[in-house]
Curated annotation (Swiss-Prot):
Possible transcription factor. The modification Phosphothreonine is found at T301. Signal peptide: none annotated. Its main location: nucleus. Pfam families: Vasculin (PF15337). It comes from Homo sapiens (Human). This is Vasculin-like protein 1. Residues 262-277 have a biased composition (Polar residues). The modification Phosphoserine is found at S49, S76, S202, S292, S382. The gene is GPBP1L1.
Amino acid sequence: MAQHDFVPAWLNFSTPQSAKSPTATFEKHGEHLPRGEGRFGVSRRRHNSSDGFFNNGPLRTAGDSWHQPSLFRHDSVDSGVSKGAYAGITGNPSGWHSSSRGHDGMSQRSGGGTGNHRHWNGSFHSRKGCAFQEKPPMEIREEKKEDKVEKLQFEEEDFPSLNPEAGKQHQPCRPIGTPSGVWENPPSAKQPSKMLVIKKVSKEDPAAAFSAAFTSPGSHHANGNKLSSVVPSVYKNLVPKPVPPPSKPNAWKANRMEHKSGSLSSSRESAFTSPISVTKPVVLASGAALSSPKESPSSTTPPIEISSSRLTKLTRRTTDRKSEFLKTLKDDRNGDFSENRDCDKLEDLEDNSTPEPKENGEEGCHQNGLALPVVEEGEVLSHSLEAEHRLLKAMGWQEYPENDENCLPLTEDELKEFHMKTEQLRRNGFGKNGFLQSRSSSLFSPWRSTCKAEFEDSDTETSSSETSDDDAWK
């Protein structure tokens, strides 16, 4: 049989040439032979169900199932296709166009024009498995022998990824005018997509599945080796042994997930001193640099999907790490936090704030209280602090005041009053969010320290804004 007229049925099923396409389905409809293992398992299940619909329909009864007239019957071509004892059987009176459409598209795309072996069976196979076992036993035996022969012949063609040379040989046999892309061949409802084939093949040989889906199998393995060589250096102290190069389709994904969690958990210790380690996973996840070992173009999932999901995961988990850090910090320092918080609120935001003299060991409190978390968190909170600085400067706060006479030292009365107020606020549940409150209140502490009279007079603008801020934190 000439391979150049093997065209999918939905392209020209009005011409008599397409009558060869029912033979493309050969024995797949009803025969559950081991010959079908590893082939199109999904489409076989699909077409068994369609067999039950088409072949057991009202047209097919046990008496007249052999020569039932049908719209899709091409007697001349069918009798030409299969001769001899099969001549009376090849009518196939039950709508082969609909049921064979998936196999035509499948063999056209995956096998590469394998129609020449399939015409021997004719299309009598659609009766099998449907409770019509009217063939003589000799025909069944012959058919099984032919199945075994075809099993050997189809090995290379069924799996072009296992034998790329055979696939290259069969590629030119396609008709030149036949469109083979997805855009020219929109997949119909009964045509299984290409990913089904790749999934089926990938159970047996994942590397072959990758090379079938992508034309560069070497780039994937190079990608895997690069990944395994880069990843252990990142989370060496977190995972005891490095992950070997991926051998299953999910292995390299899990590898990347481990690397992601590992880099995040390592950034919990180190990211607060070096801000680059926090931003580095996000930059890599954005997928902008194709040279990074994790997002090379040979990934099975598109890099854009991975990057968007990983970006959201990383940002979400980074905030979780931050909240955990704040929580543990609050728990660790809960014992001596009340004294430190009093000192935190009294002294300035940083050392270079208003140059006032320190009293009552405020320098030590500053080291224990506010400066320590700022050092640990590094530049993670710097953008919010800068925004608050800008807000305070816009409201009239001066970091380096020109009038130094405004900067008066604190007195004992002020300290006592402030201790009483903070103790009262802590009883009201003000200290529940501990560290955050001390940070925010310390931002407003220059107003308290510079404006002694306004601090005692609760009707002024600054102290009213202060009390409203405290109420908001309750």
